[in-house]
Amino acid sequence: MISLFKCLILCVVFWLVCASTSIASDYQPVPGVVDLRSTFSDGAYDINSLVRLARSKGIQVLFINDHDLMAMEYGIWPLRNLIRKREERNSILKMGADKYIREIERVSQANPDMIIIPGSETTPFYHWTGSPFQGKLTAHNHEKRILIIGLENPSDYENLPILHNHHSVRISRDNLPGVFFLAAAFLAGLVMLWWKGPFRIAGVVVMVLSVVLMANSNPFNKSPFDPYHGDRGSAPYQLLIDYVAARGGMTFWNYPETKSGVRQLGPIMVSTRPYPEALLESRGYTGFASLYGESITVTEPNGIWDMVLNEYCRGLRERPPWGIATADFHREGESGEILGNYQTVFYVKEKKKAEILKAMRDGRMYAVQGRFPQVPVMDEFSVSSADMTVKGISGEDVSLTGHPKIKIMLSSSKPLAGQVKVRLIRSGSLVHSVEGTLPLQIEYDDAYFKPGEKIYYRMDMRGAGIIVSNPIFVNFVK
């Protein structure tokens, strides 16, 4: 009888361990590439060609992020919207948002084994300093950019609250008071035409001025801002973030530490300084580019990412920001880059579009950079209880009654030569590091436990490639 009881206990323990370990094994990794350009803006390939190229490399998920609008304007005061110079290149809005969405749908239907997700790269705002007459005209923050992901309604693009967006005939709410005032003035002038003497002349003047000012007010512009009144802080970007969120889309700050934003561009200067502080100043965005073609510092221990994540843990933010890899892919071989060097790997239960989007929204993914096809792989990053009955992966919350146990397993898709350094970070503090060669397995028991506290763990790997994980949150309970 005692032996039977022991057997039952062992079976229960075995079931609990298997159940907990299956939390991670229930998910399958699906590689994707974010931040692709097509011929709808400044990319070299049409969407169908991008799909064929990705399939040949085993990449199953593509995020098309063409520029929604590539335009700059400078107008002469006081009629800046009438006496102006405008430069515009190919973009979603210039080519047609409806055409863009329909083409993605057509290619998706023709390639059911691939997942193609629409989006855009956007520049909500920039501002001018200097003068065109003195040769020192400078556009500031024109390359301070946000990726939009998951919007599938053409009207959502046509009404984006960004500068110079006149691609919808719908008058924005912010412009209605001015439109009503000028319309009333025009009607008053029309009435004055029936009067005699100087009143009739005044009526003509009022009507002409009303029409001119109405045209100059640009009532179809979707942004309440203009580029002539200096820096407006985070307001234009927060407006865009909130607009996209209200329509079910996601937003990611792109290239927050850009090194190429200051240069001569034809007769003008463009000046976009690194903007990592945007991660702190804005709210409600989904994440940011934690890995791209430049060195960055925001992911360093106790850097800006950790500051924002700790704000979330303290209840000062509604959601944490997730990290993704952004490819900025325009052409195979351009600047030495090829499709597949920068990937975001999603953990999903089924390879479906809705599952990919949910994994992205929930942070169940990691960013990786290699030299395709030699790409490092994060086989496991998990936090569990000591007895393995509770276990979580990136993007998840776990509640623990004791010390956390962290497990990291790394390998590579093809043999990789060279050393790697793996760092484990707890709430901004570097708590453990290991150097070695791939494949590599790390198990670390963290002697940290404070009931009532919320913390997180994240890891990165550098050397023979780069991996940046998303955080796993831990709630300590008694």
Protein language model features and the residues they cover:
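Active-site neighborhood of phospho(di)ester-bond hydrolases with catalytic His/Asp-centered motifs
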Residues: 32-36, 61-67, 91-95, 117-120, ...
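Bacterial N-terminal signal peptides
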Residues: 7-19
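Catalytic domains of carbohydrate-active enzymes, especially glycoside hydrolases
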Residues: 50-68
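C-terminal functional module detector
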Residues: 2, 23-29, 41, 47-51, ...
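Extended substrate/RNA-proximal surfaces in nucleic-acid metabolism proteins
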Residues: 83-91, 97-278, 430
